[in-house]
């Protein structure tokens, strides 16, 4: 059973260089990743200098685009968890995570992925640079994108024999038209007139 999400406490966003450094230090912790065996990245030269590389990309974007930004997002944090019942190896979990993120983000994104093996359930932590190193644009994501990420994760996980959580179809809020129909049927004005 595979679940991919953004942590609730931060809503998956990193808002400072200090937080980015702390997050990356936690994610690549050698005690959790079997001495960095299950740590890799895309468009990262050295996983040990990931934070510096991501901050350099951000600085370059701000300089070249001449748009220094304040209170912006420095990165995004995703967690992809697997059930012990799926009997996956750490290598397989890491591979699933890499394939998922490469398909979701494309080849130009800058991210690091680390598979934590310190708990009974194996899980990937992914830290994505909010600034794309090739386009120098910011990463944009909406609810539909997160659903697309979940679908990609489910499909790739299924290829490795993982059980998939069946998600109920998402209910969208009432449309304005439905709201007007409801008001017409349930108007308090009729009650006042009577």
Feature map (PLM): residue ranges:
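N-terminal nicking endonuclease/strand-transfer module with a His-rich metal-binding environment
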Residues: 1-194
